[in-house]
Amino acid sequence: MVVINGYSFKTQQLLTQQPDHSQLTQFVQPQSQSTHSVHPGPSPGQQQAGGSMTMPSSSTGKGKREWDINDAIVPHVPDQEFDEFNEWSDGHVRHIYSLHNEEAKKHISGWAMRNTNNHNVNILKKSCLGVLVCSQHCTLPNGSKINLRPAICDKARRKQEGKACPNKSCRGGRLEIKPCRGHCGYPVTHFWRHSGNAIFFQAKGVHDHLRPDPKNSSVSKRAFGRVPLAGKSANGSVAKKSVIAGLVKQAKQQHSLISKVLKRPAVSNPLAHTALDIYQYNACGKCAGYSHCTCSYLDDSTTARSHQLSQSSNYGTNSWPLSGSESSAPCETAANVFTVNHQHITYNYPIYHATPAAATAAPSKSPSLPYACSISELAAYQQSSSGNSFAMGVPVHGHTQCQAVAYDSSPQLATPEPEFINYSQIKHLGGGGGQEEISCKAEPGPTIKYNATVETQPYVEDNYDYYYSPKAEYEMQQHHHQQQQSHQQFGGNQTAGHHYYESSSGYNGVSYFDTGTTTAPGNTATGNGLEVGYGGYYDHYTSYEQQMAVAGGFATAGGSTAPTVAAPPGHPPPPPPPPTLTYHHHHHHHLHHPAAATGLAPSVTH
């Protein structure tokens, strides 16, 4: 048996009936034409080894080859029978190219053909992408239409679509894809197959669009920017200038960033100045405004005031070398500084003090926010704790002049930002919704919301929960407590509210804890009282604190406690209710004082 184009024939029929072979070819010819191929009929063939056949050309030219690209066995073609390469193959055609033909090996085509998945790995299948045309169907000066070759890459082709028409006379035209639908509504398909010494090519379908312009045509180059429309030199210079401008901008941005990074250690280094410098800066009452201190607080001649020199004995063996210093810089009285910030005190973290310069930029991690409170508040309140107290923000030394201090949404700090901060228990004030401005000229004191959680800092973000002071400041607070227990706060009760225990940090002192039971007056009804989640971490202490507060006669119902008016100068102030204290076994030393709700400032202020 011999298989020819899928038909089986007996060997005896081919060998013994040579005169009848013409009838065989006539039988095969209609079958081949019924497959929609336009090939001429084969000539009398010769049997080849392996079952393939070579059919030489007839006297009128090359004969039609009876093969299909999907055949299991394709015919063997002699070298003299190879076709010349055709770049614009159109219609149902078959070509056999030499294995050494460079164009055939590259599968080149004038049409925009892209690779398509095929189930047969031995056959390369390509489909036509169509042509790029103008949306306005404009006509070139030579009378032709815009027909540009689409890019094979999907990304590049998407960039081509929507570009302006390269025709100079076109107005508003855009390039768009006209897809190929020449093969039964589908793109025309090309097949390539390498077999033996030949490359077989077969096309199915007729292109229903014009031939696209080649890539190197002038219209194509002008359309896709390979040749500038306004001249090569002008466009090139503009592009070069834009690139240079972009590089200069990047360099400036990097330079500014580097300068900020280099300046930051000099500003925020917590150990840049000594403790004496920082204390002198904090003690300065001359600059009670909201900006940088203008005093030479780093000058050796400008030291603490005389009323602070009396406290130098408290700083022996500590980091505050105040002994032997004299006061030479006259500062304003501290009566015009009356903001008191009670802050949490924690000793189980390293304690650092930022530099005074950092106090203006560090509080909210943003240099754009102003520094809202002078550090001299600390010294002002230390002076008041030696026998005077502030009631609801009204100055006590008889000063009734207008104070240019207002509580706004900007951060207010009594001390610079520490190095380590626990952000888990921050208390939000909602952007200063309950803040009021300080009135002037002996008017009733405004409602200043503050307690042990530094409520004068209305942060929207979670920042600055705890503020730390060194051991020396805390011992100074303890010293003031011991001096003033008999005549100011506790009315002779020397042991009222004092719980001593030894912590792991070596501190033996008072354990103050704020459970959030002291609500600022006038703020509970307005929704600016203590938030629900504030005391959640210490819920087991809250009930005890509330019981102690009720037992001590401190009523928080309604949140409106009558403000206490300051006593005239020379008279001791009325004693505030005893503080509510809680003894607990972790190393967070917190201040809880019910006087914070009434505006009475306790003696511990750091």
Swiss-Prot record:
<feature type="region of interest" description="Disordered">
    <location>
        <begin position="475"/>
        <end position="501"/>
    </location>
</feature>
<dbReference type="GO" id="GO:0003700">
    <property type="term" value="F:DNA-binding transcription factor activity"/>
</dbReference>
<dbReference type="InterPro" id="IPR003902">
    <property type="entry name" value="Tscrpt_reg_GCM"/>
</dbReference>
<protein>
    <recommendedName>
        <fullName>Transcription factor glial cells missing 2</fullName>
    </recommendedName>
</protein>
<keyword id="KW-0217">Developmental protein</keyword>
<feature type="DNA-binding region" description="GCM">
    <location>
        <begin position="65"/>
        <end position="224"/>
    </location>
</feature>
<feature type="compositionally biased region" description="Low complexity">
    <location>
        <begin position="44"/>
        <end position="61"/>
    </location>
</feature>
<dbReference type="GO" id="GO:0001228">
    <property type="term" value="F:DNA-binding transcription activator activity, RNA polymerase II-specific"/>
</dbReference>
<dbReference type="GO" id="GO:0021782">
    <property type="term" value="P:glial cell development"/>
</dbReference>
<comment type="function">
    <text>Transcription factor with a minor role promoting glial cell differentiation and a more significant role in hematocyte differentiation. Gcm2, together with gcm, is required for the proliferation of plasmatocyte precursors, the expression of Croquemort protein, and the ability of plasmatocytes to convert into macrophages.</text>
</comment>
<feature type="compositionally biased region" description="Polar residues">
    <location>
        <begin position="20"/>
        <end position="37"/>
    </location>
</feature>
<keyword id="KW-0805">Transcription regulation</keyword>
<feature type="region of interest" description="Disordered">
    <location>
        <begin position="561"/>
        <end position="606"/>
    </location>
</feature>
<dbReference type="GO" id="GO:0042690">
    <property type="term" value="P:negative regulation of crystal cell differentiation"/>
</dbReference>
<dbReference type="GO" id="GO:0006357">
    <property type="term" value="P:regulation of transcription by RNA polymerase II"/>
</dbReference>
<dbReference type="InterPro" id="IPR039791">
    <property type="entry name" value="GCM"/>
</dbReference>
<keyword id="KW-0804">Transcription</keyword>
<dbReference type="InterPro" id="IPR043020">
    <property type="entry name" value="GCM_large"/>
</dbReference>
<dbReference type="GO" id="GO:0005634">
    <property type="term" value="C:nucleus"/>
</dbReference>
<feature type="compositionally biased region" description="Polar residues">
    <location>
        <begin position="490"/>
        <end position="501"/>
    </location>
</feature>
<dbReference type="GO" id="GO:0042386">
    <property type="term" value="P:hemocyte differentiation"/>
</dbReference>
<dbReference type="GO" id="GO:0010001">
    <property type="term" value="P:glial cell differentiation"/>
</dbReference>
<dbReference type="GO" id="GO:0035165">
    <property type="term" value="P:embryonic crystal cell differentiation"/>
</dbReference>
<dbReference type="GO" id="GO:0048813">
    <property type="term" value="P:dendrite morphogenesis"/>
</dbReference>
<dbReference type="Pfam" id="PF03615">
    <property type="entry name" value="GCM"/>
</dbReference>
<feature type="compositionally biased region" description="Low complexity">
    <location>
        <begin position="594"/>
        <end position="606"/>
    </location>
</feature>
<dbReference type="GO" id="GO:0030182">
    <property type="term" value="P:neuron differentiation"/>
</dbReference>
<dbReference type="GO" id="GO:0000981">
    <property type="term" value="F:DNA-binding transcription factor activity, RNA polymerase II-specific"/>
</dbReference>
<dbReference type="GO" id="GO:0000978">
    <property type="term" value="F:RNA polymerase II cis-regulatory region sequence-specific DNA binding"/>
</dbReference>
<dbReference type="InterPro" id="IPR036115">
    <property type="entry name" value="GCM_dom_sf"/>
</dbReference>
<dbReference type="InterPro" id="IPR043021">
    <property type="entry name" value="GCM_small"/>
</dbReference>
<keyword id="KW-0539">Nucleus</keyword>
<feature type="compositionally biased region" description="Pro residues">
    <location>
        <begin position="569"/>
        <end position="580"/>
    </location>
</feature>
<dbReference type="GO" id="GO:0042387">
    <property type="term" value="P:plasmatocyte differentiation"/>
</dbReference>
<dbReference type="GO" id="GO:0042063">
    <property type="term" value="P:gliogenesis"/>
</dbReference>
<feature type="compositionally biased region" description="Basic residues">
    <location>
        <begin position="583"/>
        <end position="593"/>
    </location>
</feature>
<feature type="region of interest" description="Disordered">
    <location>
        <begin position="20"/>
        <end position="65"/>
    </location>
</feature>
<keyword id="KW-0238">DNA-binding</keyword>
